[in-house]
């Protein structure tokens, strides 16, 4: 699960894709993006839905939901958000976190199971520790911007990203989760 959260964090860090140096590829990335990664069948990776706001001055913001559905009533879920400085050179996105946070938002069954199981409590502690580790303050990943400029493929996870649209259903879902957890 450590790898899952680190991968999720890498995707979340996309929040700063336009280059401060004004390179045209970086400028093409400026705007709002929704990225989605579907978990593997072995449940070793999280289903991720991330929203990035990429500013042309090299600053950015992000928020997202990472989850694994264990069964219909048991979902392990984390809400993440943060601010970054970013740069894109030669199809490699690099970013530095300015701040970040992760909040558990598990289903009631998952929260109950974690509360009653020392091993699960330790795993969650390790995940949160990994998330906040200074070693994750700087991340680099390869990117591929599709020719029309409205689609993006990120890193080894091959998360697919698209530009945010008006009345976007994924933005509404994120708003619901982040407004609930205030």
Regions found by a protein language model. Give the residues of each.
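Sec-dependent N-terminal signal peptides
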Residues: 4-14
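Lipid interaction determinants
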Residues: 17-89, 94-182
């Amino acid at each position: 699960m450590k790898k899952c959260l680190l991968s999720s964090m890498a995707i979340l860090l996309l929040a700063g894709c336009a280059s401060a140096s004004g390179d045209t590829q970086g400028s093409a990335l400026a705007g709002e993006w929704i990225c989605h990664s579907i978990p593997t069948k072995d449940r070793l990776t999280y289903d991720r839905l991330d929203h990035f706001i990429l500013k042309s001055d090299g600053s950015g913001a992000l928020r997202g939901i990472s989850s694994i559905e264990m069964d219909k009533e048991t979902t392990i879920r984390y809400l993440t958000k943060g601010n970054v400085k970013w740069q894109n050179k030669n199809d490699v996105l690099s970013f530095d976190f300015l701040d970040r946070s992760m909040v558990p938002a598990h289903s009631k069954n998952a929260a109950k199971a974690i509360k009653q199981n020392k091993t699960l409590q330790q795993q969650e502690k390790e995940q949160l520790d990994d998330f906040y580790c200074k070693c994750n303050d700087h991340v680099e990943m390869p990117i591929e911007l599709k020719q029309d400029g409205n689609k993006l493929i990120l890193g080894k996870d091959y998360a697919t990203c698209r530009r945010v649209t008006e009345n976007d259903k994924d933005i509404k879902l994120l708003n619901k989760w982040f407004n609930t957890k205030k």
